[in-house]
């Protein structure tokens, strides 16, 4: 289920049909983002490939890298991050992964590859977040 308005739609639905597909990614949801199987009328099992991913936005340009250096210098330990798609966010994410920053949080719409690099570098733990402490939140 999506992290948007679908929970409200389910409350008004006459029938609820879900597809279970082991090839689709799954993320732990917050209240209202999951559905109890007892509320489901029909289950369709599928093994279709995952929905095509968006491109990563390409390699950062020299300007992207220069601006990213200025941005990363302003990020404090414990900051909560949001990154988008494109050369600039890729450059920012790469520099964060290589930095001395720590205790970072994630609260973002899109979980882009740069977040994987930052997480693998041990920079993300969400310890300082006021909301959803310890969790990486994405839609």
Feature roles, as predicted:
Residues 1-139:
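Conserved phosphate- and dinucleotide-binding cores of soluble alpha/beta proteins
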């Amino acid at each position: 289920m999506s992290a948007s308005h679908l929970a409200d739609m389910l409350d008004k639905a006459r029938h609820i049909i879900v597809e279970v597909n082991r090839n689709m990614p799954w993320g732990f949801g917050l209240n209202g983002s999951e559905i109890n199987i007892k509320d489901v009328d029909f289950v369709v099992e599928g093994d279709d490939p995952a929905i095509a991913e968006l491109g990563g936005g390409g390699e950062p340009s020299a300007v992207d890298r220069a601006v990213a250096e200025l941005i990363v210098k302003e990020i404090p330990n414990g900051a909560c991050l949001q990154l988008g798609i494109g050369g600039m966010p890729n450059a920012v994410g790469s520099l964060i992964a290589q930095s001395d920053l720590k205790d970072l949080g994630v609260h973002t719409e899109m979980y882009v590859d740069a977040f994987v690099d930052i997480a693998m570098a041990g920079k993300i733990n969400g310890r300082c977040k006021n909301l959803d402490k310890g969790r990486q939140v994405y839609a």
